[in-house]
């Protein structure tokens, strides 16, 4: 369970978030919507540890994680999927899924993650994660890597971008 208590954040003298309170129970799918510039991405970056709030508290399963950085939060089971997936020259799709899972997965297991996001695994498993892939293909591969991580909480920034 994730809980935010009175989260505030400012940048360049402008208040972006003010007294945000939110509770997300386990096994829930939550969507936060709003116009451009309303603070959605900022909130996701604060939860993931990329940004630090000016004030407030972030609790994960009752533990205060406010002072923890992105690496420590990732170890506790929080993952973040960026609006623009990263491309990796020289890294295959299978390599990326294995890295995400923390295991040396069989090709069949890695392919299963691709199949779950609607991709024909045999067409992608050995391809490099580079500029030859479209934005939509990269996004699906990124979602497959998120699934391979098996985290407690996954934050998607503009998942349909």
Residue ranges and their predicted role:
Residues 2, 17-19:
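Conserved structural motif at the start of ABC-family nucleotide-binding domains
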Residues 33-35:
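The feature captures the beta-strand-to-loop junction immediately N-terminal to the Walker
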Residues 48:
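Helix-to-loop junction immediately C-terminal to a conserved catalytic motif
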Residues 64-79:
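ABC ATPase NBD coupling module
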Residues 84, 90-109:
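Q-loop/switch helix immediately C-terminal to the Walker
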Residues 143:
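Hydrophobic anchor residue at the start of the ABC signature
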Residues 146-147:
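ABC ATPase C-loop
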Residues 154-158:
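Catalytic Walker B motif of ABC-type/P-loop ATPase nucleotide-binding domains
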């Amino acid at each position: 369970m994730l809980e935010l208590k009175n989260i505030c954040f400012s940048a360049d003298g402008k208040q972006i978030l003010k007294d945000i309170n939110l509770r997300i129970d386990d096994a829930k799918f939550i969507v936060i919507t709003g116009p451009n510039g309303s603070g959605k991405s900022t909130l996701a970056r604060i939860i993931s540890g990329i940004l630090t709030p000016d004030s407030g508290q972030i609790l994960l399963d009752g533990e205060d994680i406010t002072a923890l950085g992105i690496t420590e939060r990732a170890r506790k089971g929080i993952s973040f999927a960026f609006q623009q997936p990263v491309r990796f020259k020289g890294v295959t799709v299978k390599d990326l899924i294995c890295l995400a899972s923390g295991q040396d997965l069989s090709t069949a297991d890695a392919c299963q993650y691709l199949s779950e996001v609607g991709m024909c695994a045999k067409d992608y498993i050995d391809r490099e994660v580079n500029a030859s892939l479209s934005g939509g293909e990269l996004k699906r591969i990124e979602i497959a890597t998120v699934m391979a991580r098996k985290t407690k909480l996954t934050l998607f920034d503009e998942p349909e971008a």
